Amino acid sequence: MSILWQSSLYAFGFYVALNALILLVLGVLVTRARVVTKTDIGDSGKPEMARPLRAHANNAEWTPMALLLMWTLATPIGTSIWLIHGIGVPLTLGRILHAIGLSSNAGPSALRFAGMVLTWIAYIVGIVGVFWLVFTPQSPAS
């Protein structure tokens, strides 16, 4: 059995690493666009900078809170590993789809839309899970 199915913390770490990799790739794409357009700070009014900047920024805006929700659920002993994967899979897939959709299309995009819906699903699962954890009577730790 894979270690990803043995521990909520290992599964959480896996999704942190995957989402850090996504952010790194998006950051490299911004740097590449800066080199190509000779842009130092911001977008310098160059429209070709808008999509890579927004793809990176959008990921940086949405991913941390979802990972924090996941961490809140991964740390208590006995939290279902399915809950961690129920947040991690849609979050990671959603962030990838959104970045591809935003990077490849200036206008509306089905991939971008699907990515946001999956990200919202991850948020909803995480929010409900944390509320359940907080408001459900737990047995005291021994």
PLM-predicted stretches and their roles:
Residues 1-7, 139-142:
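Short, strongly hydrophobic alpha-helical membrane anchors
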Residues 97-124:
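Interfacial loop-to-transmembrane junctions
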Residues 72-93:
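Short alpha-helical packing/oligomerization segments
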Residues 28-54:
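Cytosolic, membrane-interface loops and tails of multi-pass inner-membrane proteins
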Residues 128-142:
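Juxtamembrane boundary at the C-terminal end of a transmembrane helix
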Residues 15-18, 53-56, 83, 87-90, ...:
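Physicochemical signature of membrane-embedded alpha-helices that form the seven-helix bundle of GPCRs
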Residues 58-71, 123-124:
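Core segments of transmembrane alpha-helices
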Residues 8-25:
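Alpha-helical transmembrane segments
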